[in-house]
Amino acid sequence: MNMHVDMGRALTVRDWPALEALAKTMPADAGAREMTDDDLRAAGVDRRVPEQKLGAAIDEFASLRLPDRIDGRFVDGRRANLTVFDDARVAVRGHARAQRNLLERLETELLGGTLDTAGDEGGIQPDPILQGLVDVIGQGKSDIDAYATIVEGLTKYFQSVADVMSKLQDYISAKDDKNMKIDGGKIKALIQQVIDHLPTMQLPKGADIARWRKELGDAVSISDSGVVTINPDKLIKMRDSLPPDGTVWDTARYQAWNTAFSGQKDNIQNDVQTLVEKYSHQNSNFDNLVKVLSGAISTLTDTAKSYLQI
């Protein structure tokens, strides 16, 4: 089947498995000018960097623990290294910038290379798939911007929760060898601050709201105008589980509360982990898209040159 037909169908319906298959066959169809993984990395598009940084942030969050009493001995909680989350956001932002720059370069090559080869007067009609490719590049840039904005916002939220979890041990202590004291009111105030300052993100103009709602699930809500808001339900459950300041619980009751409270923290982690996995999948789709686009540009340019030689 003609590569252009296959590609047009795959791009129109966003059939990423089909694009992946096309990317694998591109060397046979488009000569030696298709973009390789090494080319992507040379252009600064190395998905491993942001994904490793995000993985480190998830690991850091997972390592957080509340103070506890184990075998009769009080054990301090573990605080987070918050710079890990900053590093992840910087990596996501830098990777998105490199992806966008690469698409803009391909767009220039597509419009300049194929049309300029045909001459200013346009001796031939543009390939029917040309406008489709331009549209796909535009959609690709929109998706990059959206994912970068959302992942950055979720990472900031993740960091805020990690900060609260780190401060918990300042308000939890051993009353004696059988009881724990918890200043729940102060912890409530910390959690409420996070709820009151949850980051909001804006999808790019023209984004498919229904598609993004399906993509992101119930960890966030998306308004009809494309405003993305983090679902605070898990934080609210954590806040509402807390007792007043100065509460004393025996070890069994404290541990039961700790288990439920930490369970909500784990649920937040799962939400972010799921988004990071989707972000990784999006990066894989991007790599395959670029390989297909670069091969198509090579083919279209060769076609234009061949026409002029007739």
UniProtKB/Swiss-Prot annotation:
User: Record's domain comment?
Assistant: The N-terminal domain is an intra-molecular chaperone that prevents premature oligomerization of the residues on the coiled-coil region that are involved in interactions with the needle and/or itself. The residues in the C-terminal domain probably form oligomeric structures at the tip of the needle that are responsible for the regulation of secretion of other effectors.
Which residues, by range, are in coiled-coil regions? 127-171, 250-299
Subcellular location(s) per record: Secreted
Cellular compartments per GO CC: extracellular region
Keywords (A to Z) from UniProt: Coiled coil, Secreted, Virulence
Annotated source species: Burkholderia pseudomallei (strain 1106a)
The name on file for this protein is Translocator protein BipD
Q: What does this protein do?
A: Required for invasion of epithelial cells, as well as for survival within host cells, escape from endocytic vesicles and subsequent actin-tail formation. Probably regulates the secretion of effectors BipB and BipC and their final integration into the target cell membrane.
Q: Which InterPro entries match?
A: BipD-like_sf (IPR036708), IpaD/BipD/SipD (IPR009483)
The UniProt entry lists the main location of this chain as: secreted
Task: Please report which protein family the annotation says this sequence is part of.
Answer: Belongs to the invasin protein D family.
